């Protein structure tokens, strides 16, 4: 189901109920841009902290324009999952000094057009949102009784014009009509809040309240002392305004409250965007970033990482093309997994997706991630308990517990990021040290071209005459070492901190000097004692 500002508040109770009743929730998002510059290129040298530091300053200029959530409920009697999917269309907003901005890239626009992204829905019907830090700012102005002035700062000309026109209508009604009440239709929640307070200030004798059954109408009484009616309390008006401005943050808070497992595919960037857009600006500290995410989403599963780890249990003939989301979903949906020939759960959508549905639509991709999670969990549970048992969500979650809070890291020094514990030590093959024997300055591009024939590598200088090479597989290391064993142009060996780094060599020389000096001192002392 598409969720925009037109139907969000009508559906919010249903969304809340589906979140509460679910056994897990899958997530996906579509972005306005991606990091493509050379400085953001994935590298096998990267630690997770270095990767985070590369991205944190640039993420603020990019936004999630679509968020997909699918709530999976389990029916034990039918041994089936019921999936309810939502696609939330989000659009930045201006309120006071909060001027949410974003950039688009031509390549991203082309990609989104290819996958039928609805830009009109994004711009005209997009749901507003704030982060928790934005909410704290609004509440501070509210406590200081400055919320009215703060919100007024960002009024556009058309909004000011509407407020003035409505005020004139009320003035005319008061002077020329005998009716006791008057209604104003105000769709804009910000204008509605401001108009309540503006009218009370201009015409102290009137009473304003929200119309029963229609929150977009302002009901005005000529006499504020009329029996049975009273002004809508300012606190209620402020609550309503902030509730509107928070927008999609209500859903984030529901996810935080109910602590349901969150499932996604390749979630590293998703977590960066989620933090920046709904928690607050990304912190300088990588550790604090992980802590903040874990406090909101304490249980995360990444099907990209899980499938990577479990693929080692498949034979070559039964493995998937790749563990990209589309390939993984089709592998399971087309029942190509021989590990899942018996007893798999039915997964049924409450509202089917459009027959022309394509990948890279957030709602559909979220569903696909959840579907793959169910199949991976079933496979893992079967290995633990056998194929004859009914396997519900608890058994699946227990079987996948070793992968909990481990988010895939693409082409980095380690294969995953751990949001609840320390990250793992580097688990890539040993680095190679390449020394140029003929030239005084190593040609890094030439070395990259030569060694690139062995497979995908990353390379960086290590002094004037040497470079470090990172590979993705041990067989590449072995093959390179064997091929260049007696090469006259380059000496290639396994990298050693003590042997090849300046600090390491300095430590060795310092140790040698200290050891030598101590030995001379002892010899001198011994010789002196003999003479005496």
Curated annotation (Swiss-Prot):
The keyword Acetylation does not apply. Its EC number is 3.1.13.-. Mg(2+) binds at residues 28, 30, 270, 365. GO terms for biological process: nuclear-transcribed mRNA poly(A) tail shortening; piRNA processing; priRNA 3'-end processing; siRNA 3'-end processing. The chain crosses the membrane at residues 503-523. It is found in: Mitochondrion outer membrane. GO terms for cellular component: endoplasmic reticulum; mitochondrial outer membrane; mitochondrion; nucleus. InterPro entries: CAF1_poly(A)_ribonucleases (IPR051181), RNase_CAF1 (IPR006941), RNaseH-like_sf (IPR012337), RNaseH_sf (IPR036397). Its cofactor is Mg(2+). GO terms for molecular function: 3'-5'-RNA exonuclease activity; metal ion binding; RNA binding. 3'-5' exonuclease that specifically cleaves precursor piRNAs (pre-piRNAs) at their 3' ends. Trims pre-piRNAs to their mature size, a process required for piRNAs maturation and stabilization, and subsequent pre-piRNAs 2'-O-methylation. The piRNA metabolic process mediates the repression of transposable elements during meiosis by forming complexes composed of piRNAs and Piwi proteins and govern the methylation and subsequent repression of transposons. This is Pre-piRNA 3'-exonuclease trimmer. It comes from Bombyx mori.
């Amino acid at each position: 189901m598409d969720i925009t500002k037109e139907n969000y508040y009508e559906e919010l109770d249903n969304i809340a109920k589906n979140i509460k009743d679910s056994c897990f929730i899958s997530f996906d998002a579509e972005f306005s841009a991606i990091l493509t510059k050379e400085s953001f290129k994935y590298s096998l040298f990267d630690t997770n902290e270095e990767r985070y530091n590369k991205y944190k300053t640039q993420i603020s200029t990019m936004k999630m324009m679509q968020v997909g959530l699918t709530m999976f409920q389990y029916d034990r009697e039918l041994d089936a999952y019921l999936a309810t999917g939502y696609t939330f269309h989000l659009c930045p907003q201006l309120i006071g000094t909060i001027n949410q901005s974003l950039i688009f890239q031509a390549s991203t626009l082309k990609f989104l057009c290819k996958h039928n992204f609805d830009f009109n829905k994004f711009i005209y019907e997009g749901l507003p949102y704030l982060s928790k830090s934005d909410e704290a700012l609004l509440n501070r102005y509210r406590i200081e009784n400055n919320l009215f002035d703060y919100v007024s700062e960002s009024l556009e000309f058309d909004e000011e014009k509407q407020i003035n026109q409505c005020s004139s209508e009320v003035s005319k009604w008061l002077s020329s009509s005998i009716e006791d009440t008057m209604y104003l239709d105000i769709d804009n929640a910000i204008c509605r809040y401001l108009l309540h307070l503006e009218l009370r200030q201009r015409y102290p004798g009137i009473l304003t309240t929200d119309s029963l059954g229609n929150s977009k109408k302002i009901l005005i009484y000529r006499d504020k002392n009329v029996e049975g009616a009273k002004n809508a309390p300012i606190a209620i008006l402020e609550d309503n305004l902030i509730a509107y401005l928070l927008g999609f943050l209500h859903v984030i808070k529901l996810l935080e409250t109910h602590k349901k497992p969150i499932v996604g595919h390749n979630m590293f960037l998703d977590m960066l965007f989620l933090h920046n857009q709904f928690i607050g600006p990304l912190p300088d500290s990588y550790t604090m970033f992980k802590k903040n995410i874990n406090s909101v989403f304490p249980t995360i599963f990444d099907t990209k990482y899980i499938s990577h780890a479990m693929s080692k249990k498949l034979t070559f003939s039964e493995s998937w093309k790749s563990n990209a989301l589309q390939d993984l979903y089709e592998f399971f949906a087309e029942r190509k997994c021989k590990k899942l020939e018996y007893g798999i759960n039915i997964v049924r959508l409450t509202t089917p997706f459009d027959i022309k549905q394509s990948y890279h639509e957030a709602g559909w991709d979220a569903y696909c991630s959840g579907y793959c999670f169910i199949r991976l969990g079933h496979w893992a549970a079967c290995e633990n308990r056998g194929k004859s048992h009914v396997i519900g969500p608890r058994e699946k979650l227990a079987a996948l517990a070793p992968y909990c809070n481990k988010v895939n890291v693409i082409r980095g020094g380690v294969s995953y990021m751990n949001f609840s514990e320390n990250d793992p030590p580097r688990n890539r093959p040993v680095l190679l040290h390449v020394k140029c024997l003929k030239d005084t300055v190593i040609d890094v591009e030439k070395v990259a071209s030569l060694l690139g024939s062995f497979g995908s590598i990353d390379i960086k200088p290590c002094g004037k005459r040497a470079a470090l090479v990172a590979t993705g597989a041990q067989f590449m290391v072995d093959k390179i070492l064997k091929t260049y064993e007696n090469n006259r142009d380059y000496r290639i060996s396994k990298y050693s901190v003590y042997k090849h780094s300046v600090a390491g060599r300095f430590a060795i020389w310092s140790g040698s000097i200290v050891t030598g000096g101590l030995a001379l001192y002892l010899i001198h002392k011994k010789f002196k004692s003999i003479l005496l």
